[in-house]
Amino acid sequence: VARMAEAAWRRIRSLVARRRPRARVAAAWGGRAHVEGVDRDGLAVALEVLSAKRSESDVVGLKLEAARLAELALGDVGPAKGRAAVFDGYAALLPAAALSPVSGEVSRVVDAVFPSADPELDIELARLAAMVSSARPQLLSKFLARLDQGFHPVSDLHFLITVARIPLQRNSAQRKRTAAALVGLQAKIDRMSLNQDSNWDDRLGELYAALCANDKQLPRAVLETPGFGLPSHVLFLQRMSREDRPRARATFVAAIRKAGEDYPWSGEVVRLLGESGDAQTLKLLRSAHERVDVRGSVVLELARRTQGVDRKRFVAGLQSSSLAVLSSCLGALAKLPAARGAREQLALLSVVRRLGPAAQEHGLRSRAVLVLRRNTGKRFGFVTGEKGRVAQQTAVAAWTDHLERTYPEETKRLLGAAAASLPVLRKRLVAVDWDGGDVSRGKQVFTKRGCVGCHQGRRALGPDLAGSAGRFSRADLFTAIVLPNRDVSPRYQTTVVQTSDGRVYNGLIVYQSVDGLTLRTGTNRTIRLEK
């Protein structure tokens, strides 16, 4: 029907006008392609079928088809410039002015039919009301009544998005029901172990903003709802007043203390607590440093108000693979008085050794050297700034030799059992006749020992070693062979994943989604791990 000539379509339309509803719905569905703007005839057919009370066994299926026909007649749903993406499946592509003449009739029919005996039909009826931004108070009450603890979270989301499209004033009971649905959404998702898309917070934030636009008192109602204080609730603070924000933070603190070690900390919660200058709140924040998943976020917040009591945390943060965390820790240590502790100097040395000459990394290397100079009074010729963006083998070796000789016990502790072999290695390197070396034999060892799998080719897990002799000293290269984990650049630090059945995988994450992740291992295997 959609591909018919206009004259043929008009004839078909007149012929099916006296036919059974299913034929009329099918013809109108295909005929939508022949109509610009709102398809009044198709909409009339759809609303007639939706309103009818029939006893046929397939009446629900027919009404579902009619609901879809009504959506098509209204221009269908989809993305539009300037409209939040959360409404892509709930807002018509046609402008509001085109829908206004039919909004009342659509709302009246939906009100008469909703709720039906079929959940799927109810979803489409609600979508119709959302498309025309129904202003019918009865529908708002009916849709809000579906926000109940017994419904699936997907159903809650559907009706929350629907009511966000209804521009009517809310009463106190409606406000509380909306707030309870928002606050309880994450708990439902967690209980059912449902996966959440990486764009979840963005879409939920858009939904919340629209709900608040219809009800300015909703943020406070959310704050006063029992159960408020989970990490997913932080985004609700975006619409809270400045006066309510400290109260909200106190509610999070109470929730954390009540849950104890079971509280699911997140970076957002850490940042929220970091806004407080309260000593007890900061103490609670420091306790989260023991959790690996938020340790970086904790250090970032503590660095904003550098205190000597956190020095050991800043030193530990120097091992982070995050350059942002590393930068904050260096900045905090630079603000604190000079110290000569072994752990701090060797952690700073680790930064100097593992970072490269790229602009951002060299900037951090230079800052680490400046703190070392202040702490030790030594210089060793390391060049900071733009001119220093080269390997600087001699300076790095001098710093390494000085600090390892100054702090031998801490060096052994950090390097582990392999540290005992370093003196022997250094003596052997001195005795080797380097002029008698054979490159071809080296290539054979490089291949046979499996080094090639990680350090050569486009699928390599580690850095390509071509030209490495020009970037590192001979001693450093052999030390890296003996202690391969000593100086690992942040870009090549791997992730260890343990599955529920006890299997362990180690590799670089090359792709991550809501359903799982893909690892590339040192044996050049690409493994997909499902959640």
Per-range role (PLM):
Residues 459-484, 494-531:
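Gly/Gly-Pro-rich "capping" loops immediately C-terminal to redox-active cysteine motifs
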Residues 122, 458-459:
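Short, histidine-centered active-site or binding-site loop motifs used for metal coordination
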Residues 22, 134, 168, 452-453, ...:
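Flexible loop/turn segments at secondary-structure boundaries
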Residues 290, 447, 456, 482-483:
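Residues at helix-coil transition
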Residues 1-445, 468, 474, 500, ...:
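Long, ordered, helix-rich scaffold segments
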Residues 488-492:
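Active-site phosphate-binding and catalytic loops of NTP-dependent enzymes
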Residues 442-458, 465:
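The canonical Cys-X-X-Cys-His
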